[in-house]
Amino acid sequence: VHAKTLIDGVSDTPKTDQLITCEDGKIIAIEDYHETNEPVVEANVVTPGFFNCHVHIMEPVGFGTDKEFTFIEKTFYTQKHLEDYINSGVTFIRVLGTENDYDMDIRDCVDAGIVKGPHMLCAGRCICMTGGHGWQGGIEADGQDECRKAARTLLKKGVDLVKIMATGGVMTKGVEPGSAQLTQEEMAVIIEEAHKAGRKTATHAQGTQGIK
């Protein structure tokens, strides 16, 4: 690749006229541009891949909450999303909530080269209170014991991180978006279990009360 401008994420300033050599999908050399017998792709700007740290890989976008989709429809939307990420330069995504923990199956298929897509960290199902935000595809848990069990269940299935619903949200009907839902005590045991397993957590917190 002949990069007229290269932003490598390490240098203080962009570099110009760089030759990037790739082999088996990996960059093996970056040097000042020179003539070569190998095929060269011209690129105005080359940067490291972008990260998107909050996605829901199986959810079609732009349809609101009223339309329902079949599993097959969601599967093809998922494939389209994966292609769109790669084509827009996104090479890493953090998936924060997927029904039936399907995101981990998708992650494994990407890693195995079965389908093309970005690198993925997956949270599986979110943990929410009964009837709370995300209950349709999440694990409903009330009290510290149920929350601890929910976290352990997800960790057993192989999640990369655990997603917690601290407040309501706009995409769940009948729920006040800013209302506090899981208690601090409930969230604490989820975080404890995740950390014991060497995993991080991510929390949906919409509104000041949930953030606090």
Enumerate the language-model features and the residues they cover.
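N-terminal metal-binding scaffold of metallo-dependent hydrolase/deaminase domains
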Residues: 1-35, 44-46
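N-terminal carbohydrate-binding accessory modules
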Residues: 45-49, 107-108, 112-121, 125-128, ...
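Hydrophobic faces of well-ordered beta-strands that scaffold small-molecule active sites
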Residues: 49-55, 93-94, 120-124, 162-164, ...
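Active-site environment of divalent metal-dependent phosphoester hydrolases
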Residues: 56-60, 95-103, 128-130, 168-172, ...
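Acidic/histidine-rich helix-loop elements
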Residues: 58-73, 130-145, 172-181
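Alpha-helical scaffold segments that flank or form the walls of functional sites
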Residues: 65-116, 139-163
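Histidine/acidic residue-rich metal-binding segments in metalloenzymes
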Residues: 105, 146-212
